[in-house]
Amino acid sequence: MAEFEEDLPHNGLMDGIASGVGVPVEALRLLLTILAGYPVAALYQKFISVIADKTVHHMFFAGCGAGLCYFNYGLDTYHSLIAILTTYFLVLLLRKKTQIFLAINFVFHMSYLLLGYFYTSSNDYDILWTMPHCILVLRMIGYGFDITDGLKEESELSKDQKETALKKPPSLLELLAFSYFPSGFLVGPQFPFRRYKAFVDGEFRQHEGNVEAGVRRFGAGAFYLIVCQVGLRYLPDSYFLTPEFAQVSFVKRIYLLGFWAKFSLYKYISCWLLTEGALICIGLTYKGEDKNGQPDWSGCSNVKLKLLETGNTMEHYVQSFNVNTNQWVGQYIYKRLKFLNNRTISYGAALGFLAVWHGYHSGYYMTFLMEYMVVSTEKQITRFYTKVVLPQWGHILNNSDIYKLLYFITLKSYNVVYMGWCLTAFVFLKYERWIVVYGAVSYYGFTFLVLWAAFYHTFNHFFRSSSRKLAGEDQKLQDSNTDKLVEEKKPEDKKSE
């Protein structure tokens, strides 16, 4: 694989600050770009939002976003320009040839992204032009679907499609502004062009409370960033590849891996929260009114903090983490596969798309495979617990305080321990790295899944079949008694007649 060298703008001050605080200069640029969303929001609200000419708004967003992109990636900014221009001209030429347009648009963007991954890939996460480009790929693919949905009759569209369909293609300047939106192009979130247009047209401006909500999100993001940095200082990734980790007691190993996974997760959460705070401050994220009649500014939220911190299962993590991207995949991939008439295949295809979208590393594919297997197993366990355990022992268990305490501890322990297993491959990426960590914890994740599958299917085969057989015998006995009773009554009936 070719060695990649990035052509970034030289900045001695940035290099000096980065070395002084002990972080890579690329990471410092990324953080500063995310934080730049707040002064950009202040400038827009103070000077630009009151200007009637919408062209000025589009120029402001396109210019700020492209400038911040250049600050991070230098001349590699041209990759995003190629992507935007390609989709723009494809719309001009092929919009009414729906299937051809969608196929070319999808294949072009995914192929370009995968080629980018191929030429820039390494053993670690790299803050290169491919990072914002993967966000842009989803935006351009989703935009393509919205354009073609605009050609359909209203009756042919789903509720989601009605909210995002575009009857009229935007201008090139509008598309550039939408694509380079300052607080949305780098790490997400995804939002449709219709939301951007409504925002620029002032449809959200009369609603209050966005600045306060944005500041709260900023505070949460700063808190998670601090916890992440402190936690990973004590539990760095490299520690889990060492012989010292493998020599720790098994229970301590799996708990250390679980807490490390939490801290690693907070790295992404902090970036999303800081970005969301800037988007809220600028006023893009209005969702409607909450149950108390107050403005709800969570329209671009990418994480559900309450569910993330109080959830007990991997499914809770899936529902609370990277919410915005999951919603995008649900709307533009999963639901578009409805013609397959099989939810399992559609779900598997959606997870496969997410894995490919992340890159070539085997860790991504193992992560999404584990997600599928673990969530499926959790559903089986829930079904077994509610259908088998509770009907027989529920009256005892539900009245026991000791059981309730043990139940809580078990779920929380599972939550921490299995999070470590599931996130290992995602962080270490390469097979030769994540398999070392799996081996160091004795492959406990695989072991549990195999043991549960053996038990569950054995139970279904023997106990369920015997239960059905017993139920059938009971029914036959009941039918026999009923017939006998009928026969005994017949003479009496004849006498009465």
Curated annotation (Swiss-Prot):
UniProt name for this protein: Lysophospholipid acyltransferase 5
Residue positions with a glycan: 398
Enzyme category, top tier: transferase
Gene Ontology biological-process entries: germ cell migration; lipid modification; phosphatidylcholine biosynthetic process; phosphatidylethanolamine acyl-chain remodeling; plasma membrane organization; sperm individualization
Species: Drosophila melanogaster
GO CC terms in record: endoplasmic reticulum; membrane
Membrane topology note: Multi-pass membrane protein
TM regions (residue ranges): 31-51, 74-94, 100-120, 173-193, 213-235, 264-286, 339-361, 408-428, 435-455
Family under the similarity heading: Belongs to the membrane-bound acyltransferase family.
